[in-house]
């Protein structure tokens, strides 16, 4: 999408390791586009917005990404990527009608560490206070530890495990549809 995507250092569209393009959370036009979709969804009656892949790329030639829109803010701790993601979540929160739940999906490693482990800018400690719920693919065994990590980052943010990872092989009589 013209004027909204991540660029490489040569000024061309950045393709990650999966040959996918990414919107640049540092660009106002990209954030406005996503907020318009979210606003339309809530106008149609959706009561929860679950945002997935709210990060910068973590695969491909990461050193070739033009991160000029993700420079660390003066007098702020951490990475400008995290600051951009947090700013985006604050903007989304501002356009949501009263009573609409804002949720974010993170991976279990990010939740356990509390910080961006994959250089994508996701940091539980920065993002959890801005949303109502954190979702994560998890096994039943790791659910309580992940829930505790989310609570430690924000006492107002809930945790919802996506029990998609089987702790043990399913019996042959079970059918798993994904």
Predicted regions and their residues:
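Extracytoplasmic/secreted cell-surface and envelope-processing proteins
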Residues: 1, 58-61, 111-115, 143-146
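Active-site groove signature of glycoside hydrolases
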Residues: 25-26, 34-63
């Amino acid at each position: 999408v013209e004027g909204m995507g991540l660029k490489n250092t040569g000024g061309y569209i950045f393709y990650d390791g999966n040959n996918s393009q990414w919107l640049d959370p540092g660009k106002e036009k990209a954030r406005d586009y996503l907020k318009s979709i979210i606003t339309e969804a809530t106008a149609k009656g959706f009561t929860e917005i679950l945002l997935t892949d709210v990060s910068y790329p973590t695969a491909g030639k990461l050193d070739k990404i033009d991160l000029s829109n993700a420079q660390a803010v003066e007098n702020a701790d951490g990475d400008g990527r995290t600051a951009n993601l947090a700013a985006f979540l604050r903007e989304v929160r501002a356009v949501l009608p009263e009573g609409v739940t804002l949720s974010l999906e993170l991976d279990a490693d990010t939740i356990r560490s509390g910080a961006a482990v994959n250089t994508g800018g996701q940091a539980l400690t920065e993002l959890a206070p801005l949303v109502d719920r954190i979702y994560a693919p998890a096994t039943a065994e790791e659910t309580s530890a992940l829930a505790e990590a989310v609570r430690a980052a924000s006492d107002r943010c809930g945790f919802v495990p996506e029990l998609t990872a089987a702790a043990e092989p399913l019996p042959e009589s079970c059918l798993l549809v994904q």
